[in-house]
Amino acid sequence: GDKRILIDSGMHPKAESKDALPQFDRILDEPLDAAILSHAHLDHSGSLPVIQRHYPEMPVFMSEATDALAQALLHNSVNVMTSKREELGINEYPFFTHREIHKVNRQWHPRRNGKKFELHETGGASCTFYDAGHIMGAVSPLFEFSGKTIMYTGDVHFEDQSIIKGANLPSEKIDVLILECTRGGASRDPEYTRWSEAEKLALRMEECLEARGSVMIPLFAMGRTQETIMMLHELQRARKLRNSSFLIGGLSIKMTKIYDRFSNRIRRNHQGLNLMRVKGLLSTPRSRGELPKLEQGNVYTLSSGMMTEKTMSNRLAQQFIANPRNLVACVGYADPDSPMARLIGSERGEEVLLDSKKEPVKRQCSVQSFDFSGH
């Protein structure tokens, strides 16, 4: 047909300044009829207010949960970009303001999974959302144009996680498939199950806690934090893991509260279970920048997942990794250039650079990786 639909509008997670933006100049000469946001992660949503500035009347469709999560994440992105403007002298930051997010949100139109909707008021193109199983609110849109069907999976995951159920995609024939392949080159033990991996994690945590150590699990604030808290709760209920205090903070708290708002409104495991009321879950100090106290026997479930500089997990790690009784458990993706990857690749007793503006820290703790991919 003659409709032009934008699918996702992210920011490059490793680039800075304008290099982080998509090549918008390649599409700005033509109109856009609508946009689809498959899920809230910043590599899919991070530049949406920028493109909406060029197309202020363009409707943007997403799930209701993605609407809530993406708003919170974009507001946090403004804060991060503002800090980087001051620290790194990147004058283009922030790409948008808090006020602009509120303004462009008026063109956001949440839609329910499984319900076909028109992408434009003149008709000619429709879309149906299907559950993608990646994080809360993630969808795989199925487009229909002129009797042809196109499916974009977005980030997709087919196994049940602790909270989010596996993808629920249509079985009928489609004409074109646009498929993500994050793990396209990764093999996995055929005996692997998510629960067996959880039991391995619990065993290592028990060894650490029995030896009077503490555990740090660096986590992405949205998605991985909530899945991990639920998994630890499941392990405790199954008597695989002792009752401990789980500490979360900052953006992780905000995202967990949004997950709780949808606990009865989405297709998920543990319907209605409120994560903020899970036994042992504690909020870290409220004052900005204050680190939680390092106490024996605690489990520090802190962002960011890659131990990015200036984040709580990175700053606490500078004290944490010096204790040989402690354990750092990596449960998500670690970019090869990240502090988390440097820690994983180090040997006990080796110095690890966690912050480019500080001295390296000698790693004495245990470090182990576990596979809980959302792809």
Language model regions located:
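His/Asp/Glu-rich metal-coordinating catalytic cores
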Residues: 1-36, 41, 45, 50-227, ...
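Generic long, charged, amphipathic alpha-helical segments
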Residues: 351-375
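Conserved beta-strand scaffold positions in the cores of enzyme catalytic domains, especially
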Residues: 108-110, 178, 328-330, 364-369
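Substrate-recognition/cap regions that form aromatic- and gly/pro-loop-enriched pockets
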Residues: 344-349
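Short, basic, glycine/proline-bearing loop/turn elements
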Residues: 32-35, 187-188, 296-304, 365-370
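Hard-cation-handling environments
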Residues: 201-342, 354-357
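A conditional alpha-helix N-cap/helix-loop micro-motif detector
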Residues: 41, 194-198, 280-281, 306-310, ...
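Solvent-exposed alpha-helices and their adjacent loops that cap or buttress functional pockets
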Residues: 27-29, 168-171, 292-294, 320-321, ...
